[in-house]
Amino acid sequence: MTPANYGSVFSCCLFSSLMMLYLYVFCRSKRFILRNGTFVIYLAVGVVMIRMLLPWNFHFAANVESHKILPFLFNLLRVKILSVEFLTILVIIFCFGSCLRLALYFYKLVRYRHLLHQLDPLDDIRILRIFSDILEEYHCTKQILIYQVPGLSSPAISGLIHPVILLPDREYSDQDLRFIFMHELNHYLHHDLWKIFFWELVVCIYWWNPLSYMIRRLIKDTAEYANDIRLTKDRDELTRTN
């Protein structure tokens, strides 16, 4: 493995962008997921993520030398603006933007946990009993608190280490609660929160690449669709529709 340089970083960005474009164009359809499953998508995303976070040239890689395109691009980027190379300015902007995005992202996580701790966990006996039955059905021993959040538009699960389920502040039937808890618990058991978290880090670092945002949407949509398939595969048509 050779040290990172401008050439290896450019190759890393080019390879990753082509892979992300391929994933978004060919792998986001429901037909693809049904035929190949979600593992193929997550494996490809994992390869892209590792490559994006390791911008080095590896000894086992087959490197193709560029005698025209790369030299032309680097000569173009080495034009000086007020005695500073344009490439240096770009690197500073990209690094500053990445650090700022990472800082803001973790600040939002800390602020969110702080706001959550100001709420009291749900103590409704009926809701807790239904949730306890679902936990037992899924053989899940993790302690997961439930919060009712005013103004929340839809149920969600949050938290990587200490997950919590968030419910909008309204009335629910027993059947609604069962489906909500099964849906959110499946996200936790299949590590969907971790998948999204790691890709959020990639988005923070590659904030300037629009394809990273498109793959973030792909990961979320894939997780939701796979979850729906798991919950409805053994249900009758009326239940699936509901």
Which residue stretches match the model-derived regions?
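Membrane-embedded and juxtamembrane structural elements of multi-pass membrane proteins
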Residues: 2-63, 81, 85-242
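Membrane-interfacial helical/loop segments at transmembrane boundaries in membrane proteins
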Residues: 65-80
